[in-house]
């Protein structure tokens, strides 16, 4: 294979992405040779294709986010005939020396085992930060783990459309394949599941079919849905990951059995390796031959046979040790500490809290309680809008009355200027109070309905109007404007800034998806996405999000109907904390507080509660850049 771009780096990896929740070394299994075979070696007399590198500009599906990709074109490509193609997610790894897809294609096309096909190696998008003081937004989980057709539509409507400007690509779905590893395996399958009119041939290696963003629902969905004409090759290993989202070694056979049950053409390769590309790479030639056998005959759905799916489970061998494993035969697993992930695969919630440090009530029971907010000294203020009072809780848990006759003030936030800001819904205005307790109340803005506020270090105030479904901003000069009115957020209820104040997170009290917007230099909201995916209650139609907060690692904490849901930076819900009281009374706010900002405060049923955590909250006057997340 010839590379046309000088210095075009390729990845040689034995393990691409460690699963969240931590990894541990498993007992070594029997030695297995997963070295690359003859199909993966350059062969004498075989024509070499070319590989070029490109950048796809941001588009409508992932706004503000460019994508890098490479295109392999076989030597046998004929511009006069529409060409088949395959798309490889996390493409640099597939194109690199560890997997050698271009070499394998050279050899198999030369032997006429495959039609002359192009290969597209696309990497997940990264939305660049606006400054080096802010963190990028990493789109891999959002792109690959989502069950919606957004990513498939992006591939067809933007990526393939761009490549088709230079090459004659077939528009027949029978000529299209897609492959992915780990989370990319989910992305590959979901793309074909949602758009079988575009993709019919699928490869997933060590697919992350656990409950990250709902992929664990797929087996049941497959069994209940009219079969779709796709052919699927799957691979997993006995020493693959086990974490809060499930067991890879069990979830993959569940998927394969469901596909077999539905009548799909499916094959699963069970091996001894961990979360690695080695096994899949060692059988890539065989995999591609199986996937494209009998081409150009169209892929159809067969009639399920009695007992379909049972044979797959019969291949499973009980493991002596059910531990999270990567087992890279000498390769150390990458550390995830910087991303805030726990040290162990089980009880991952205890990376956030201690099991013996439970919720404690602060103060009495009030007519109402909402809008917890932290000041510089660790004191937490909360509102009783029914009684028109604001209370102050100190670090020791003592509660005193801070203000009376507040005209129903709520949506409390402490600004960088040291004042307490609040929204008075009845009088349609935003006010601020001096924290000294002096009778110093300033009207910040009038004729404004603000259900929640988010304050920046520079003095801008973002507000959300739930009824009008808009987000607005008051800048430091007092200028007011609407920065979101798109209508996609069903019930915008809550706001918070990311730790670096580069993005605004908007809670949706109805939908499961919470929104992430980049804040432009002029304060406008751009590049919005339904980014964080929450779990939904079995009863009721709504997420019930009433408040948002973030910690210094960039995790979002959402007060919701299910409890406190914690989403890691890339948007996956990793943990759910119990509500202080196990009843139907909703949470009404959430905030970090205490002198070290390590206490989590929530309000529920007219009460203020707190508990210690292992995380640190952030404040308006001290933006911090969170670490790059583990993907």
Feature-to-residue mapping (PLM):
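Bacterial N-terminal signal peptides
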Residues: 7-18
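Non-catalytic cap/lid and distal C-terminal segments of serine-dependent acyl enzymes
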Residues: 25-324
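Blade/loop signatures of beta-propeller domains
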Residues: 327, 333-358, 621
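Beta-strand-rich domains and repeat architectures in extracellular enzymes and scaffolds
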Residues: 342-347, 359-388
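A short beta-strand motif characteristic of beta-propeller blades
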Residues: 358-364, 398-403, 439-445, 479-486, ...
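Beta-rich, blade/repeat-based domains predominating
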Residues: 364-379, 405-424, 428-429, 445-463, ...
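Short loop/turn segments immediately following beta-strands, especially the blade-tip
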Residues: 517-524, 613-619
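Blade-level signature of beta-propeller repeat domains, shared across WD40, Kelch, NHL, RCC1
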Residues: 588-631
């Amino acid at each position: 294979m010839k590379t046309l771009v000088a210095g075009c780096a390729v990845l040689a990896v034995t393990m691409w992405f460690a699963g969240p929740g931590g990894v541990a070394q498993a007992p070594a299994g029997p030695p297995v040779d997963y070295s690359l075979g003859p199909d993966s070696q350059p062969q004498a007399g075989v024509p070499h294709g070319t590989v070029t590198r490109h950048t796809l500009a941001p588009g409508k599906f992932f706004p503000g986010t460019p994508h890098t990709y490479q295109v392999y074109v076989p030597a046998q490509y004929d511009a006069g005939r529409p060409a088949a193609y395959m798309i490889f997610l996390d493409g640099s790894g597939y194109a690199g020396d560890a997997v050698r897809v271009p070499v394998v294609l050279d050899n198999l096309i030369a032997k006429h085992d495959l039609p002359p096909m192009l290969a597209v190696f696309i990497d997940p998008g990264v939305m660049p930060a606006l400054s080096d003081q802010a963190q990028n937004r990493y789109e891999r989980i959002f792109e690959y783990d989502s069950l919606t057709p957004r990513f498939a539509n992006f591939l067809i409507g933007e990526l393939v459309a761009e490549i088709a400007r230079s090459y004659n690509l077939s528009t027949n779905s029978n000529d299209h394949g897609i492959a992915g590893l780990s989370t990319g395996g989910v992305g590959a399958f979901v793309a074909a599941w949602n758009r079988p009119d575009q993709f019919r041939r699928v490869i997933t290696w060590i697919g992350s079919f656990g409950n990250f963003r709902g992929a664990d629902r797929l087996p049941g969905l497959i069994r209940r849905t009219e079969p779709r004409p796709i052919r699927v090759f799957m691979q997993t290993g006995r020493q693959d990951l086990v974490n809060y989202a499930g067991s890879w070694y069990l979830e993959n056979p569940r998927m394969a059995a469901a596909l077999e049950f539905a009548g799909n053409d499916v094959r699963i390769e069970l091996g001894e390796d961990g979360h690695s590309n080695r096994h899949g790479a060692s059988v890539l030639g065989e995999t591609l031959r199986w996937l494209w056998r009998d081409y150009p005959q169209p892929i159809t759905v067969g009639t399920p046979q009695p007992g379909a799916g049972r044979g797959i489970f019969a291949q499973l061998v009980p493991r002596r040790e059910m531990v999270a494993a990567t087992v890279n035969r000498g390769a150390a697993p990458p550390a995830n500490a910087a991303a805030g992930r726990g040290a162990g695969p089980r009880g991952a919630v205890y990376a956030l809290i201690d099991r013996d440090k439970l919720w404690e009530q602060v103060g009495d029971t009030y007519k109402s309680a909402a809008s917890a907010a932290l000041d510089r000294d660790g004191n937490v203020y909360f509102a009783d809008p029914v009684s028109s009072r604001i209370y102050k809780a100190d670090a020791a848990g003592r509660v005193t009355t801070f203000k009376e006759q507040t005209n129903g003030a709520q949506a409390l936030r402490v600004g960088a200027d040291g004042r307490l800001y609040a929204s008075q819904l009845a009088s349609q205005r935003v006010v601020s109070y001096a924290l000294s307790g002096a009778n110093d109340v300033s009207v910040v803005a009038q004729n404004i309905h603000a259900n929640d506020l988010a304050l920046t270090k520079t003095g801008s105030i973002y507000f959300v109007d739930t009824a009008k479904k808009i987000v607005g901003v008051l800048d430091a000069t007092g200028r007011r404007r609407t920065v979101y009115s798109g209508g996609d957020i069903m019930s915008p209820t809550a706001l918070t800034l990311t730790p670096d104040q580069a993005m605004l997170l908007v809670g949706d009290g109805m939908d499961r998806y919470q929104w992430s917007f980049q804040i432009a230099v002029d304060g406008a909201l751009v590049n919005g996405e339904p980014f964080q995916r929450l779990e939904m209650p079995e009863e009721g139609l709504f997420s019930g999000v009433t408040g948002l907060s973030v910690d210094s690692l960039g995790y979002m904490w959402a007060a919701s109907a299910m409890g406190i849901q914690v989403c890691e930076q890339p948007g996956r819900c990793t943990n759910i904390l119990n509500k202080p009281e196990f009843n139907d009374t909703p949470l009404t706010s959430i905030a970090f507080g205490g002198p070290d900002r390590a206490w989590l405060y929530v309000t529920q049923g007219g009460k203020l509660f707190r508990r210690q955590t292992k995380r640190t909250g952030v404040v308006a006057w001290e933006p911090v850049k969170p670490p790059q997340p583990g993907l």
